[in-house]
């Protein structure tokens, strides 16, 4: 009888030990499972947060690559599709490095070229507006350099002459930017600021300050800096023709046709020389 009692007690204790062991094993599995799930969630959350943000140095280096690509595309600007790709590259550079002055003023320059060569009215208007915005950004970034002021003023001038959007620019806006360029660098772009000021006087109605004689005066100031500037000679010839100085106009036009063009400005030279020949033929016909 006592043996049966001892046997039952042993069985109970054995059951308790087995139950406890099983319970501990279960707890251990639960803990391991919980830890595994926790690690999985942590890893997933790390992946969802995305890659670490690039450092400012990395952003600047990447923006510099975009600038290099943009310059290469601008060299093919005769193909407006390549020019548009260059504009995209400059926008990317500014997104990566918002304080990049070179990207800002070049974006203004590229948009000006697109606006003055596109046959699509909406694209032209949009490009002038984008050029003005980029020029303003450049001026805000480095007000003491001429590039931003010049291309802002150029886009103001183009918008005033061509754009169907009213209120983008006034004669005073153009004049103020070009006068700022002259204070900072009188010979900038081979006297181009004098040329733009002259065009303001040449093309503006008299009621807002247009005056062909003043146009001649302004453009002549650019001649000491503008010997290789085909467009300066062309527009000065136009001003001479308007005030009846045909011999002086012929002289400027022949300078264009006889000059050796800068390889970096072949598209501009081709345009200027074609217009020069047309004006020369017109003057010769009387």
PLM feature spans:
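Bacterial N-terminal signal peptides that target proteins for export
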Residues: 6-35
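C-terminal motif of bacterial Sec signal peptides marking the signal peptidase cleavage site
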Residues: 42-45
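Bacterial signal peptide processing site
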Residues: 47-49
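Short coil/linker segments at helix-helix boundaries
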Residues: 52, 61, 65-88, 107-144, ...
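Short solvent-exposed coil/turn linkers within tandem alpha-helical repeat scaffolds
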Residues: 96-97, 186-189, 262-263
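Residue-level recognition of tetratricopeptide repeat
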Residues: 100, 145, 188-190, 229
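Alpha-solenoid helical repeat architecture
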Residues: 227-233
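Long, ordered, amphipathic alpha-helical scaffolds
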Residues: 236-286
């Amino acid at each position: 009888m006592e043996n049966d009692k001892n046997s039952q007690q042993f069985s109970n204790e054995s059951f308790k030990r087995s139950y406890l062991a099983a319970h501990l094993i279960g707890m251990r599995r639960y803990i391991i499972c919980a830890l595994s799930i926790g690690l999985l969630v942590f890893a997933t959350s790390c992946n969802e947060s995305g890659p670490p943000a690039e450092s400012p140095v990395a952003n600047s280096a990447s923006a510099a690559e975009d600038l290099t690509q943009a310059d290469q595309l601008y060299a093919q600007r005769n193909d407006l599709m390549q020019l548009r790709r260059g504009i995209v590259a400059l926008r990317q550079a500014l997104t990566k490095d918002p304080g990049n002055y070179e990207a800002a003023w070049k974006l203004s320059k590229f948009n000006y070229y697109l606006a003055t060569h596109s046959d699509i009215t909406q694209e032209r208007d949009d490009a002038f507006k984008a050029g003005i915005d980029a020029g303003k950004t450049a001026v805000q970034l480095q007000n003491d350099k001429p590039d931003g002021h010049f291309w802002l003023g150029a886009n103001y001038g183009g918008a005033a002459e061509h754009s169907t959007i009213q209120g983008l620019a006034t004669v005073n806006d153009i004049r103020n930017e070009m006068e700022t360029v002259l204070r900072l660098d009188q010979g900038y772009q081979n006297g181009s600021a004098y040329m733009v000021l002259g065009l303001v006087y040449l093309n503006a109605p008299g009621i807002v300050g247009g005056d062909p004689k003043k146009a001649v005066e302004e453009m002549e100031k650019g001649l000491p800096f503008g010997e290789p500037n085909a467009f300066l000679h062309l527009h000065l010839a136009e001003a001479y023709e308007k005030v009846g100085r045909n011999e002086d106009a012929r002289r400027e036009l022949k300078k264009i046709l006889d000059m050796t063009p800068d390889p970096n400005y072949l598209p501009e030279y081709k345009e200027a020389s074609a217009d020069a020949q047309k004006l020369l033929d017109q003057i010769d016909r009387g």
